[in-house]
């Protein structure tokens, strides 16, 4: 009798396909981003970035301290400061942002007629 009762509790319910959680989705997105070739900005790209952001010799150190001395990376779509990958795709005020899309940078250059 005891064995029969225990066997009732040991029965496994049929597993249903579970939807991925938000954490799993973010992990998958990060893995996809890591699969893309990430590299440092070329000197030409860095110069474009500086122009678009209005970085001049007068405010260089303010930006340099904020961006860890311009250790900027790109995957072809986004530019971000190394270590701030979580900022990619987020809309933050310009003075708090640590990731920018190339589209945003191009639009800034157009606005400034550069």
From Swiss-Prot:
Annotated spans, Disordered: 1-37
Biased composition (Basic and acidic residues): 9-37
Lineage top rank: taxon: Bacteria
InterPro entries, per the entry: Aq_1974-like
Name the record gives this protein: Uncharacterized protein aq_1974
